[in-house]
Swiss-Prot record:
It comes from the Eukaryota. It is a single-pass type IV membrane protein. The keyword Transmembrane helix applies. Belongs to the BOS1 family. Signal peptide: none annotated. It comes from Yarrowia lipolytica (strain CLIB 122 / E 150). One of its GO terms (cellular component) is Golgi apparatus. This is Protein transport protein BOS1. GO terms for biological process: endoplasmic reticulum to Golgi vesicle-mediated transport; protein transport; vesicle fusion. The chain crosses the membrane at residues 206-226. Keywords: Endoplasmic reticulum, ER-Golgi transport, Golgi apparatus, Membrane, Protein transport, Transmembrane, Transmembrane helix, Transport.
């Protein structure tokens, strides 16, 4: 039990460290960090389930109560970590959306056209060509930035979906364990009932057999003395 408790302590410390790094810069944190946090939380949850099973098998009352208190504290910290991670992802998505809007509507494509309309009487063709090329490069760079931000947004959505699937997998895994436990309990009860019924039938046979043997004995005794 001490070994798995120490493992939980290490997982909890690693999770807090990653969340602290993510909270320091939600918008600029790499996607790999989010994946690492999701994986750590999933592993942490599974270790807690294993720890709970070990606690249920503990016969020492004092050790069991102490371990249950630790388990409750770890589960509470995991719930807080999930809530914090969700808030950080929401903050990152809002920041990304704001940057996309700024990149999309921040530049005014009519500014240069107005300047050229004001100076249309000036016959300087090279300047017009240079400005057009510069504007085209800016628009191309803006488009590339938008594509990159959209890709980041898609990756974030994929990571969020992966995290949700992992949480659902944990829930299904926990439910499956409970169902197996109930099935095992029912199976044991059925075996016990079958054994009791079998023993009852055997007792009935001995009882009725004893009655028949006693009647036969009475018959021969009466016949002998008569």
């Amino acid at each position: 039990m001490n070994a798995i408790h120490n493992h939980l302590v290490k997982q909890n410390a690693s999770l807090k460290k990653d969340l602290s790094e993510f909270s320091a810069n939600p918008a600029g944190a790499p996607m790999s960090l989010q994946g690492q946090i999701s994986a750590t939380m999933t592993s942490f949850s599974r270790t807690l389930d294993d720890y709970s099973e070990i606690i249920n098998k503990e016969h020492n009352k004092e050790k069991k109560e102490k371990a249950e208190a630790r388990l409750a504290r770890f589960r509470e910290e995991l719930a807080d970590a999930r809530s914090e991670f969700k808030n950080l992802r929401s903050a990152r998505e809002e920041k990304t959306l704001e940057e996309n809007k700024t990149a999309l509507f921040g530049d005014n494509p009519y500014g240069e056209s107005r300047n050229r309309n004001v100076n249309r009487d000036v016959p300087i063709q090279p300047t017009y060509t240079d400005l057009t090329r510069e504007e085209g490069m800016q628009r191309e760079q803006s488009s590339l930035n938008q594509v990159g931000q959209q890709l980041d947004s898609f990756i974030e959505q994929g990571m969020a979906a992966l995290g949700d699937l992992q949480e659902q997998s944990d829930i299904l895994r926990s439910t499956g364990k409970k169902m197996r436990s109930v099935a095992e309990t029912l199976g044991l009860s059925r075996e016990t009932i079958k054994m009791v019924e079998k023993r009852a039938r055997q007792d009935k046979r001995f009882f009725y057999g004893g009655i028949v043997f006693m009647l036969v004995c009475f018959y021969y005794i009466l016949k002998w003395f008569s």
